[in-house]
Amino acid sequence: MEKIFNYINGELVEPLNNQWLDNYNPSIGEVYSLIPDSTKEDVENAQKAAKNAFPIWINSTIKERATVLQRIADLILERQDDLAFAESVDNGKPLALAKKVDIPRAATNMSFFASAILHENSESHQMSQVAINYTLRKPIGVVGCISPWNLPLYLFTWKIAPALATGNTVVAKPSEITPMTAFLFSKICIDAGLPKGVLNIVHGLGPKVGYEITKHPNIKAISFTGGTLTGQKIAEVAAPMFKKLSLELGGKNPNIIFADCDLEKAVSSSVLSSFSNQGQICLCGSRIFIERKIYKVFKEKFLIKVKSLTIGDPLEKSSKIGALVSQQHMEKVLTHIEIAKKDGGVLLAGGNKFIPEGRCSNGYFLEPTVFEGLSYDCSTNQEEIFGPVVTLTPFDSEEEVLNFANSTKYGLCSMVWTSDLKRANRMSLKLDSGIVWINCWLVRDLRTPFGGMKESGVGREGGSYALNFFTETTNVCISYD
């Protein structure tokens, strides 16, 4: 059986304890590879390698760093088919989605930040007849990057690219549930000529590896994407140590449909924002609020499209809905579905485990599920389910839907569908969201800030925000006298 290895000091190495964890293919429900069950000692070796590599990496020129990152981006695209296949097998997502979104965006992350550091501006402030100030931005040193299982390579590169670009060295932990593309990425780094120790990847469990990365005194910053509860635990450990923290956490995002919208576009996009990646995207719009005068027609059109989605083998071109990432996660989502039923939810579509014919009959598949008749403040509309489950709720006014939308502890993103520009501006101002999409969803410009309010996280990623996070600022004041 294939083994995944840690990537430490430029080498692919076994865990020091020679202990391994099972890695499942969720579409067939079987173990297909083994990953390191790494411990404190592996993290220690990784941080030592990163610490030793830092003087070399920081003294490389910006152009040299950019060249290596761009070479990595090019190799990702050259190996796109292999990476997409690995992502689909490891995660359960449709192969077509991995080819179209995950892998190309991973390459774009690397190339974007390779280019960004070549065009970054510095600041200066002149004090008339007195002095001039200018600002230096310096890499932090060794930083930790912990990435999730839903968009494995995409979000892994989203973190390490700006960290490396700004001159830091990295100890990274990909999710133990979907480690394969990070392992393949380590081979790409070797082939691209990334200096030894600049990036170190330690596989294993969060309570072991993630905890050790978070609490290590030589790791000066933590960038984490994942669940809110895990983010809280990271903050509890890292904050007293005065580490820089970037936490991109959960979401329970409202999708608001006004009567004056482009209905066909709103319906089609709402299907995507509900069920892409089996609803396992922090940006999915799981609470759909529809202005009452178009509620019935929206519901009819939406359900027709939902019921036409093809569920099945992720490797088949026709499959739009793949497997959930694990049996444990599938059971969690099924529990939420039962809670929604007990709370009086009317099941309009789905609600059951799906058993495909053929090789995937033991996989972790769920039907896309739609409820109506639930109160805006019930647990289904308040807790992040992170699966193919959405609710439909009518509203009568802007004031009412704003109350619905802002009622959760989360504040990651919102979608608003309207042809009224003034309304769009009013809603954007009043929604508790780090991102507001007007008449679209998941349109991303990597220069823009990405992150949420409330319990959806701390800080922002993307563009200059990411570059600033991974650097420390020094102001230099020079007297004219």
Describe each PLM feature range.
Residues A221, L229-S375, I438:
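ALDH superfamily catalytic-core signature
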Residues I28-L34, I219, I256, T310, ...:
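Conserved C-terminal structural/oligomerization subdomain of aldehyde/semialdehyde dehydrogenase
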Residues V31-S38, N52-N59, C145, N255-F258, ...:
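Short, well-ordered beta-strand elements within core beta-sheets of diverse protein domains
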Residues F54, I58, A73-Q80, A84, ...:
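Structural signal for hydrophobic packing residues in well-ordered secondary-structure cores
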Residues S122-K265, F395:
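Rossmann-like NAD(P) dinucleotide-binding subdomain of oxidoreductase/dehydrogenase enzymes
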Residues M1-L34, T67, R71, N121-I146, ...:
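Terminal low-complexity tails and localization/encapsulation signals of metabolic enzymes
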Residues G29, R65, E87, M110, ...:
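Residue-level signal for inorganic ion chemistry
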Residues E30-E120, V130:
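Glycine-rich loop-to-alpha-helix module at the N-terminal edge of alpha/beta enzyme cores
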